[in-house]
């Protein structure tokens, strides 16, 4: 199963995302969506699981949860924006969600892929929206096998 992982769009969905996510089976959005229209556009590509972030308005918060826990292709996955942990770290996320095998988060705008305790994959796809903090926009692809 091929997952598209995105976060921090802040109301901007770049055209490049459509090329990168063209053949994904599911899209996971880790918050700071910015507008419900972003989810509508992503849903045209694949099913979407999303969470809200600290900058999302009440329309977005009414539609998606703060944390999503789901099982895809036999893996226990948690999606959270991460702002509830201040400046989220892989260790803090693992401590909060000890049953997860994969934890996806956003908020920091910094891409990261790491393994915690040799058992839990923690991924931050970076920010896909407007460029901030001198970091280039990014998204991620996660292949489940």
What are these regions (language model features)?
Residues 5-7, 26-32, 49-54, 79-81, ...:
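Active-site neighborhood of phospho(di)ester-bond hydrolases with catalytic His/Asp-centered motifs
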Residues 49-91, 95-99:
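Helix-adjacent hinge/juxtasegments
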Residues 49, 85-145:
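Conserved beta-sheet core of the metallophosphoesterase superfamily
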Residues 1-4, 69-78, 116-122, 144-145:
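Beta-strand-turn-beta hairpins that frame and shape the catalytic cleft
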Residues 37-38, 42, 58-61, 78, ...:
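Short acidic/glycine-rich loop or secondary-structure boundary segments that cap or lie
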Residues 1-48, 56-69, 74, 135-138:
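N-terminal active-site segment of His-dependent metallophosphoesterases
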């Amino acid at each position: 199963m091929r997952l598209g992982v995105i976060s921090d769009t802040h109301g901007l969905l770049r055209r490049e995302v459509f090329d990168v996510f063209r053949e994904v089976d599911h899209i996971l959005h880790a918050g700071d969506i910015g507008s419900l229209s972003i989810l509508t556009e992503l849903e045209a590509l694949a099913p979407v699981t999303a969470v809200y972030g600290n900058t999302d308005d009440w329309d977005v918060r009414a539609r998606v949860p703060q944390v999503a826990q789901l099982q895809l292709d036999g893996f226990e996955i948690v999606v959270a924006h991460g702002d509830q942990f201040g400046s989220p770290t892989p260790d803090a996320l693992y401590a909060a969600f000890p049953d997860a095998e994969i934890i996806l988060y956003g908020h920091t705008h910094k891409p990261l892929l790491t393994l915690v305790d040799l058992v839990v994959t923690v991924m931050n796809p970076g920010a896909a929206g407007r460029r901030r903090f001198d970091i280039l926009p990014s998204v991620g692809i996660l292949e489940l096998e």
